[in-house]
């Protein structure tokens, strides 16, 4: 796809506010800033910024979209980054009344690459929170800046392409020579890793089935757009509701809203619609199939499918399938044995094993409510040539009504 060139001229940062309407139309990908455009802007002077094509900041805030526009850098003021622990954080001053629109609530996560901040609105009309994913560029080399900008642009490109209730929503983004900021909706339940670690004993098969149904449908939707996530894991799956709400829901089949949202599209990539071939390896090793672990070219759709199998196993068992119990063996020995189990697809059920002893001849799996979950794991944690894809799993879902969701009936795949 040819990229449309944008002239940076006197602008040292570019802001691209998004509204809910833009979210639901066919996105103009060519209108996104190219890697060259942003790299050029990294060398310009911030003081040369002029933005004149946005509405005056002191207008009345009528909608949530108006509030998001409060993150737009207009006239003489800019986004301020203050230390956590102070009473004010990421916010924009109004030229009229010098009041903050947003304040840092807490730091959700922090890595060498970027920090994720929970930001709360100070506007009493909108009692809401959003998430800022913030990357500092000032301390990085030029090559590091270009690499981070490339990843940042890929994430924007992916999120602008997608419109699905189980994918996080891109609200705004911000580019300057010093920082990259991604603004997304906030999921109150946190990530599935910490939720599973804390509340796994409360998981019902219906709850796990609901999560897995949404996951499979969403990943099949990504693949219909020729997009591979490449980093599907519990940490990148967010729950839209907190524990105190989830524990009160007893009918997951007819729950009207999305329970999960997939996030973190930094490593996602668009592929050819015919062979889905990916040359590079990335993502988390614990969720990567053997072909990715060994660094060979692979079918990206089937690699995502393997990750879904790992996630489902973890939801059922409360652990990852190829992890062994702690031993005193040297690390190189543990890694070697891990790879051996991985390649052989050698995992063992404990919590979700069949209650029937095959030697007795009692093999009526219809009386075992967990058998279909084990079957799905078996279809996903297989050799790549035999592994089911999410799209193929959807056909199985259509055969079994317990795995179809009214919520997603109108989403085209």
Curated annotation (Swiss-Prot):
Residues 102-403 form the Protein kinase domain. Keywords: ATP-binding, Cytoplasm, Kinase, Nucleotide-binding, Serine/threonine-protein kinase, Transferase. SUPFAM superfamilies: Protein kinase-like (PK-like). SMART domains: S_TKc. It is found in: Cytoplasm. ATP binds at residues 108-116, 133. It catalyses: L-seryl-[protein] + ATP = O-phospho-L-seryl-[protein] + ADP + H(+); L-threonyl-[protein] + ATP = O-phospho-L-threonyl-[protein] + ADP + H(+). Belongs to the protein kinase superfamily. Ser/Thr protein kinase family. It comes from the Eukaryota. Its main location: cytoplasm. It is an enzyme of class 2 (transferase). The active site is at residue 231. Coiled coil: none annotated. Its EC number is 2.7.11.1. GO terms for molecular function: ATP binding; protein serine kinase activity; protein serine/threonine kinase activity. It comes from Schizosaccharomyces pombe (strain 972 / ATCC 24843) (Fission yeast). This is Serine/threonine-protein kinase ppk27. GO terms for cellular component: cytosol. Gene3D superfamilies: Transferase(Phosphotransferase) domain 1. The gene is ppk27. PROSITE patterns: PROTEIN_KINASE_DOM (PS50011), PROTEIN_KINASE_ST (PS00108).
């Amino acid at each position: 796809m040819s990229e449309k060139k944008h002239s940076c001229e006197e602008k040292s940062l570019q802001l691209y506010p998004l509204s809910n309407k833009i979210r639901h139309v066919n996105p103009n990908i060519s209108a996104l800033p190219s890697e060259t455009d942003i790299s050029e802007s990294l060398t310009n002077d911030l003081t040369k910024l002029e933005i004149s094509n946005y509405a005056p900041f002191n207008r009345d805030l009528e909608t949530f979209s108006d509030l998001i526009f409060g993150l737009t850098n207009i006239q003489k003021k800019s986004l301020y980054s203050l230390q956590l622990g102070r009473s004010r954080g990421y916010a924009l001053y109004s030229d009229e009344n010098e009041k903050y629109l947003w304040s840092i609530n807490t730091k959700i996560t922090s890595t060498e690459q970027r920090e994720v901040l929970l930001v709360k609105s100070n506007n009493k009309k909108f009692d809401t929170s959003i998430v800022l994913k913030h990357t500092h560029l000032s301390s990085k080399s030029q090559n590091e800046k270009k690499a981070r900008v490339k990843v940042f642009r890929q994430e924007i490109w992916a999120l602008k392409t997608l419109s699905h209730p189980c994918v996080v929503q891109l609200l705004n983004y911000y580019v300057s020579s010093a920082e990259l900021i991604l603004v997304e909706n906030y999921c109150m339940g946190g990530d599935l890793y910490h939720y599973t670690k804390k509340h796994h004993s409360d998981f019902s098969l219906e709850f796990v089935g609901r999560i897995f149904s949404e996951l499979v449908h969403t990943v099949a939707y990504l693949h219909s757009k020729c997009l591979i996530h490449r980093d599907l894991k519990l940490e990148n799956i967010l729950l839209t509701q907190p524990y105190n709400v989830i524990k009160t829901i007893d009918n997951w089949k007819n729950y009207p809203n999305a329970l999960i949202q997939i996030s973190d599209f930094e490593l996602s990539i668009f592929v050819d619609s015919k062979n889905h071939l990916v040359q590079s390896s990335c993502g988390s090793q614990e969720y990567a199939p053997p072909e990715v672990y060994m660094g060979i070219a692979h079918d990206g759709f089937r690699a995502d499918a393997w990750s879904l199998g790992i996630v489902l196993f973890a939801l059922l068992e409360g652990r990852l399938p190829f992890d062994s119990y702690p031993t005193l063996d040297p690390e190189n020995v543990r890694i070697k044995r891990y790879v051996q189990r991985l390649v052989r697809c050698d995992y063992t059920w404990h919590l979700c094993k069949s209650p029937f002893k095959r030697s007795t001849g009692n093999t009526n799996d219809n009386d075992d409510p967990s058998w279909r979950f084990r079957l799905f794991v078996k279809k996903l944690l297989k050799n790549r040539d035999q592994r089911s894809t999410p799209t193929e799993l959807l056909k199985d879902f259509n055969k079994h009504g317990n795995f179809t969701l009214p919520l997603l009936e109108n989403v085209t795949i």
